[in-house]
Structures are given as C-alpha cells and as structure tokens.
Amino acid sequence: MNLEIVDLFNGHVNSIPNILPHQLATLDYLVRSIIDENKSVLLFHIMGSGKTIIALLFALVASRFKKVYILVPNINILKIFNYSMDVAINLFNSEYILENIFIHSTTSFYSLNYNDNVINYNGLSRYNNAIFIIDEAHNIFGNNTGELMTVIKNKNKIPFLLLSGSPITNTPITLSNIISLMSDENINFGDIIIQGKKVFQILLNENGVNVLKNILKGRISYYEMPSTDLPKVQYHGKKFLDTRVVYCHMSKLQEKDYNNVRKLCNNEMFEKNMNNVSLAVLGQLNFINNLDILFQEQDKELYPNLKISNGILYGDELTTLNISSKFKYFIGKITSLTGKQFIYFSNSTYGGLIIKYIMLSNGYSEYNGSQGTNPKLINGKPKTFAIVTSKMKSSLEDLLNVYNSQLNKDGSQIMFLFSSNIMSESYTLKEVRNIWFMTIPDTFSQYNQILGRSIRKFSYFDISKPVNVYLLATVYADFDDDITSLEDYSLDEINTLPFDIKKLLYLKFKTKETNRIYSILQNISDTYRMPPHPYIVELVLGEIVRQFFYHHSRISFDSKELINAIQLVLPNIDMAKKYINEVVNGHFFVSNKVFDKSLLYRYKNDIITVPFKLSHERFVWGVNFRKEYNVVSSP
C-alpha cells in the first residue's frame, strides 16, 4: 500500500461517489506488483473495506495491457460484480478496454474449460499473458476450480490476484493452498504443519511460520477499516472467553430427544443431526436422514401438541416452544427490539421448515406469502420475514433490494431476514440493528463473514446507534458454567459438554491459531512511500478534484489552492494548469455540498460547479444504453 497516496487525502469526504484513499493506495501496489513485476498478490482486506471496487479498478487499469479474467463463486455474486463494474467505470477517469475483461461464475468457467469432466488443455492457451482475479479465493480449493487454477498457473505462468477477507476457512491447510497458487515453491505441507487428532489441533509449526514469511513477503496487502467508521457492536448474554453467549436452557421435552440423538451421533460426522436438535427437536424427524419422506406424511403426530401434514407443521407446540429453547428466547426477545434483524442458521431444509411455522404461529407473516396468526404490525402493516437458502438464486437479488431499500430502513417491508450459508459472503445488508446466530458457525472465517454482511462501511446512516449480536447456545437445564479460559476443560471433558458449547470451544481453539497467522500476514503486508504510479496518476488526480470541488462551488481559474492540490501529484506548474484546463473543458463530474451532482464549467475567469439532473419524457418506451445511438419513442 502506497502511504504517500493516503496522505494526499486528509479529511477525505466519503459520503459522495468516490474512491477511498486506501483503495487508491492499494491499487498503486497492485499495479507495481502484478503488472510491473508479474507477481501474484493476496488482497487480504477485512470484510466491508471495498475489495470488489479495488479489484475492478485494477482490472480496468490492467485491461490496457492484458486480458483479465475474474472468477466469482456464483451467479448472484456475478450480478454484484457486474453492477459494481458500472460503479467503478463511473469513477475511472482514464483509458480502459472493457472487451479485455471477462467475468465468470466458477460453474460457467468450469464449463468453458472442461469436456466430459476432463480439462481441455488445448484451450488453455487463451490465458497466455492474462491476469486472473479470484473472489473469495479461500473457497476455490478442494474442487475442480482449484485444480483448474493450479493447471493454468503451471502451464501459463501468469499472476493471480486473490481476494479474501478470511484466507483461513477452517485450518491453516487452506492458506497452504493459497501459497501454492501464488508462488513457484514446492512445499511439503507435512514439514510446516503440526497435525493433531482433532481439526482444531492443526497448527503451523516454526518452520511453517518462516516459510510463510519468506514466500509471501511482498505479496500481501492487508487492510482493516478503522472502527471509527462503524457502529459499536454490543454482544449479549453470559461472558464466554472473549465474547458473550446466550445460554438457552432446554425443556425436558427437548432435552430428552436431544440426548437420544446425541447417543447416536458420537463424532463430528453426525454434526448436522446435532445442529438440528440444537435448533429444535421434531420427534421422529430427528431420527431419519431423508426428511422428504416424512414431509409426505398425512397428519403425522410428532408430539401430543405438534403434527406434520404434507410438510406443514401445526399445533400449540409452535407457540409454547418446548421444542426449541433458542426460539423460545428469540420470540420472547424480539417483541422488545426495534429495527431490522438478520438471523443466521444452517441446514436449510430442516431449519427452514421450523423457522417458517414458528414465525407464522407467533404472528409474523411471510414476505409475499402466508399471513401470520393474529398478525403483529408495524406502521399498520404486518411484520414480515423472509428465509434465504441456496434454492433462491434467481430471486435473491430482488429480495435484497427490498430489504436494503430506504423504505425498509425501519423493517416495515421485511423485518426478519433468515439466511443459511449462502449469505455468508459477498453480499451487503444495510441498517441491520440485530444479528442472531441460531447455529454456531463452523469456523472463525464464517463467523466474521456473517457479521461482515451487515457491519461494514456505508451500511448505516447513523453509526452512533449500536448493533446487537446474539450468539445462541442450546444447553442442558442445569448447565450454567462460567468459561473464562480455553484451559478450563480437558478434551475428554469438552466432549461431555452441550454440543453448542463444545462447538464454540473448538471454534475458539481454531480462532487462536487463525489470529496468530493473520498477525504474521499483517506484519509482512507491503507498505511504502512513492509518487503515484504513472498508470494511476489520472485516477489520483480525479479524486483530488472530486474532493476539492465538494467544498468549493466557485473559484478563480488560476486558484492557488487548486493548483497547489494538483501539484502534489504534478509538481510542474505548466502540467498542473494543463490538467485543470482539461478537466474543466471536459466537464468533470463532481458532487458539491451545495449543489450535489454537478459538472465543472468555465465562466469568464472562474471555474463553477453547475448542477444537473437527468430527466425524460413522461412516457418513454425504451432506452438502450448499450447502443452507440439511442432512439427514444414517446406518444
């Protein structure tokens, strides 16, 4: 990161269309490392810091010299990248060749390069002299995409830009895959990793630390958004190590079936079953693997006060909630909370069934669906919920547009957004005031990713109000342990604890090692001080102009203040004046604090900001913005 660029923007205004200082500073580093030196880079920027825009700005710069291939996890994130590309282009006041940029989902890229599940090696020559940008890079390994990337890297000797807010998903092994893609070193991972009996006992040894430092030195960009730009996070519940957890004590009914299932699930292979009964017990549903079979039952009794018929749950148990200590706490708590709520859960089939009918039975209506019993209202309209799963790929974008809209700032359109793992990455949620974990996440990465959907820059109009986080753990009726240290229990003792508590402790063990490695990556992150790289000088100057004319509506054409600002990048006064003349005659777009959206014009001996707005006739049949010439028809 070029700190000299950051220093150009003291008092930077972030509330207008802009490129943030750290984004420009990182862009400078990427140009020097990837384009000039042909090195691969890991962009390890914590969630919410604008990795996508940095990557797309870099793609636009690189498109002048090479073809750029961008890989994203799925079709919904592809839509986000396409939208963000329009944002990046609007901020990009320099030349680019859009035809040299190709954005693919991993599935479409797979189809493009495989024939009958075999890599089409002859077709890989198209990637010679290219650059690859991979979003959520930690997720591509262990599948065909990871295999293909390794083949392309070895065959074409091209650089990669890997984007990740959490490069370790579960264990250091994930990071080892990233290292192999970024370098030409042949690493025996048995030499750098200590392998224990449990997953959380996989550690990086001293040799591994040295390998990490030696290979990744000069290949890491680390950045974390200052917390001053974010709302305070208020964790609720009982103190648990360095966080807080809400203990949800089971009823006798839940504890009985919970224990029965646990006896059958004595190792991590059956974690799904334990996640289910930790969320809620449903009698026979807990003991079969194919839920679809039971969903076809007619009036099947699960408990005396709970039945299932054609996949529909009904009965008083959905309101007394002896089947779920978590939902008993949740339903009781939300009546006193205001604002939008985001709720994470796993096992979408089982969890989605429970959520839907508990919410309906307790007066909450389904968005664009069934109305709740005795509906609870907000502003005279039913309080609604939506459940997001991987099956919603086509409609997710529309749903999130409603959830994030200004009209829904108070949750009056959609108040409760329940989501499975599909929402753990790349999406942005706005104005969420309450975040719930109905399932304990599997990894530190997943936990941070879920929080990062909401707690991010520009997601809150008022950052003085806190965001509440509720991490719920199902526990036995008599369990009330204070857990203050990872040394409180032996491994044998941990196995006897409530499943959620055991999972939390495992998570914290893994988090300890993850944080150790992240600290190493942070320390070897590249920072330097140099004038902006020639390829991005226009972008830096453009941001200086945007910031200057936010504060100034009218100035003299030979304003010393403006000339001095430009000379920070173009020291030669003639070049500085020439640049000012070009941006004024080109009617550069700015956002002014008085006139808002404006264009720069010369009026006599002054530079003025002229406000504008786009308008159209009342009845417009069509405007095709993809054509060079547009024809607008109206009555």
Swiss-Prot record:
Keywords attached to this Swiss-Prot or TrEMBL record, sorted alphabetically, are: Activator, ATP-binding, Helicase, Hydrolase, Nucleotide-binding, Transcription, Transcription regulation, Virion
Localization in the cell: Virion
Q: Check the record and name the SMART domains matching this protein.
A: DEXDc
An annotated GO cellular component of this protein is:
virion component
Which Gene Ontology MF annotations are present? ATP binding; DNA binding; helicase activity; hydrolase activity
What does the entry list as the binding residues for ATP? H45, I46, M47, G48, S49, G50, K51, T52
Locate the Helicase ATP-binding domain: which residues? 32-185
**EC class:** hydrolase
Q: Which residues form the Helicase C-terminal domain?
A: 326-505
Main location class: virion
Q: Which InterPro entries does this entry report, sorted A to Z? A: DNA/RNA_helicase_DEAH_CS, Helicase/UvrB_N, Helicase_ATP-bd, Helicase_C-like, P-loop_NTPase
What Enzyme Commission number does this protein have?
3.6.4.-
Q: Which Pfam families match?
A: Helicase_C, ResIII
ATP-binding found in the keyword field: yes
Q: Where is this motif: DEXH box?
A: 135-138
Going by the entry's taxonomy, the superkingdom of the source organism is recorded as Viruses
Family indicated by similarity: Belongs to the helicase family. VETF subfamily.
Indicate the quaternary assembly: Heterodimer of a 70 kDa and a 82 kDa subunit.
Q: What does this protein do?
A: Acts with RNA polymerase to initiate transcription from early gene promoters. A DNA-dependent ATPase activity is associated with VETF.
Q: What name is this protein filed under?
A: Early transcription factor 70 kDa subunit
